[in-house]
């Protein structure tokens, strides 16, 4: 297979995500991470992981800071990993990612896709949480993180978590000098490749590493799932992929999105919320064509357009939140 050969179901998923959130990346909502990886670049990474790290149906994949959920959905479809898990600490980006997963599940259910594709999507779980709560990365075989913009304090913590794990592979965007010498990850480089990003239009090099040693978890109370070590933070999600069916997963996602929308702005009145939805930012207003009578038309935003609007207007506030969390 050519390194950039992309499966039809993967192309369809990216098309649906584009309809929901456009080309803008994770930073478009205001985070400190600039851009979201393109479909072609992610496919290159997937093919390299297949070739060099045995990524396949038996693999378990985690995306630390999953943002809009593209890598998670991608590997759930190709190669159809056993468990695709994403964790995001920013509630707004998590909601965007959940909406992206929801529309892919909508398509799978509504269009009557094959049971195999439904099963692949059913293995994808996104959670709102803090990765620093984990003691290790078990049961994941592949740890992926778009760590451009991660503060040193967080990378030091992730090094401790990874070194206590049995996870075999680490995929990230920092070179050997930083990851091994500065942050102390017990890894060695396998391969690296250039990638392109949406939003920022920047290119970044992704580095694929393998573990060189495994430290014993002498001071950690391990729990197991399916006979494998599993950190408590990931246990329930993994069980959910084993026991839940597609319909129950789909309904659960819809309920989580609804609850998150209701609780993310607890102090906003219905009138204020209506005003926010109806009025775009000044930069957007300038792009709206005026009617013949000279008055601007400010159309009511749909759910999809509201999500895009959220991405555009909270840049400054979200960067302040990020700095506060990781000084």
Please report, for each region that a protein language model flagged, where it lies by residue:
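S-adenosyl-L-methionine
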Residues: 1-58, 95-138
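Conserved class I S-adenosyl-L-methionine
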Residues: 57-67
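Conserved SAM-binding loop of SAM-dependent methyltransferases across substrates and taxa
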Residues: 70-81
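Conserved SAM-binding motif I beta-strand of class I
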Residues: 83-88
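A short SAM/SAH-binding and catalytic strip from SAM-dependent methyltransferases
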Residues: 132, 140-153
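C-terminal substrate-binding/active-site "lid" region of AdoMet-derived donor-dependent transferases
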Residues: 150-218
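Long, low-complexity, Ser/Pro/Thr- and acidic-rich intrinsically disordered regulatory regions
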Residues: 209-317, 327
């Amino acid at each position: 297979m050519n390194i950039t050969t992309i499966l039809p179901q993967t192309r369809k998923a990216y098309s649906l995500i584009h309809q929901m959130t456009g080309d803008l990346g994770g930073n478009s909502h205001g985070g400190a991470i600039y851009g979201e990886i393109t479909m072609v670049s992610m496919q290159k990474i997937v093919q390299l992981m297949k070739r060099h790290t045995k990524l396949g149906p038996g693999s378990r994949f985690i995306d630390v800071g999953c943002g809009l959920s593209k890598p998670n959905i991608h590997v759930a479809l190709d190669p159809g990993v056993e468990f695709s898990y994403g964790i995001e600490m920013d509630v707004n980006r998590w909601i965007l990612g959940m909406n992206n997963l929801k529309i892919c599940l909508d398509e799978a259910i509504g269009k009557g896709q094959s049971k195999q594709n439904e099963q692949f999507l059913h293995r994808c779980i996104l959670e709102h949480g803090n990765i620093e709560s984990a003691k290790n990365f078990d049961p994941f075989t592949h740890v992926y993180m778009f760590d451009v913009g991660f503060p040193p304090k967080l990378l030091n913590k992730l090094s401790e978590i990874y070194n206590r794990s049995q996870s075999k592979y680490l995929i990230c965007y920092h070179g050997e000098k930083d990851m091994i010498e500065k942050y102390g990850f017990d890894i060695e480089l396998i391969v690296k490749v250039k990638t392109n990003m949406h939003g920022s239009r920047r290119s970044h090099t992704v580095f694929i590493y393998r573990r060189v040693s495994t430290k014993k978890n002498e001071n950690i109370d391990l729990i197991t799932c399916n006979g494998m070590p599993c950190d408590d933070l990931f246990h329930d999600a993994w069980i959910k992929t084993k026991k839940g069916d597609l319909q129950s997963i789909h309904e659960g996602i819809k309920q989580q999105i609804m609850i998150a929308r209701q609780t993310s702005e607890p102090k906003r009145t219905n009138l204020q919320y209506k005003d926010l939805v109806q009025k775009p930012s000044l930069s957007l207003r300038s792009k709206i064509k005026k009617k013949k009578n000279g008055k601007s038309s400010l159309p009511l935003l749909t759910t999809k357009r509201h999500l895009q609007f959220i991405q555009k207007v909270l840049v400054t506030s979200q960067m302040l939140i990020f700095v506060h969390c990781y000084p």
